[in-house]
């Protein structure tokens, strides 16, 4: 991990995910409840292999980036983007360990991810979330006040500019 905001003992820091962070990412998976996994992957995920951990570790810090929240060298949250091939648009996703939710980590990670995306030439984020996932809907509405969401079959879709 490459520190963005250093963490003091017992406090949360932010870092860029590295391919070598696989063991920590796998441990995060086992900290997530079935509901949190479903919210993140939009389908039931029972084993880490179903979440395609190698794909989740595939970061190049340009087209694919991930910011992690870290406490005592353990990952407790991940915010990532993946740029669409040949585009300046990237899809984003965020997950926070259940015991760390509602403490501002998603906001901090989204802010850092937004800054990274801006510096790498990403011009817009696309996102999909379950319509009843109120914490995530509220997060995006707070962070992107101009957000317009479309509703289809229980999902919300949105596109927001990265340049603010």
Feature roles, as predicted:
Residues 1-164:
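Long, contiguous binding/interaction regions
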């Amino acid at each position: 991990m490459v520190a963005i905001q250093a963490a003091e003992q017992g406090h949360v820091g932010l870092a860029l995910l590295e391919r070598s962070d696989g063991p920590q990412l796998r441990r995060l998976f086992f900290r997530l409840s079935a509901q949190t996994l479903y919210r993140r992957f939009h389908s039931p995920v029972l084993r880490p292999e179903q979440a395609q951990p190698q794909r989740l570790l595939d970061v190049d810090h340009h087209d694919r980036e991930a910011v992690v929240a870290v406490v005592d060298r353990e990952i407790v949250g991940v915010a990532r983007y993946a740029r669409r091939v040949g585009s300046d648009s990237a899809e984003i996703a965020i997950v926070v360990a259940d015991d760390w939710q509602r403490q501002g980590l998603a906001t901090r990670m989204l802010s850092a991810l937004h800054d990274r995306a801006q510096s790498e030439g990403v011009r817009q984020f696309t996102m999909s979330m379950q319509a009843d996932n109120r914490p995530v809907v509220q997060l995006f509405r707070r962070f992107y006040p101009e957000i317009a969401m479309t509703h289809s079959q229980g999902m919300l879709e949105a596109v927001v500019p990265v340049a603010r």
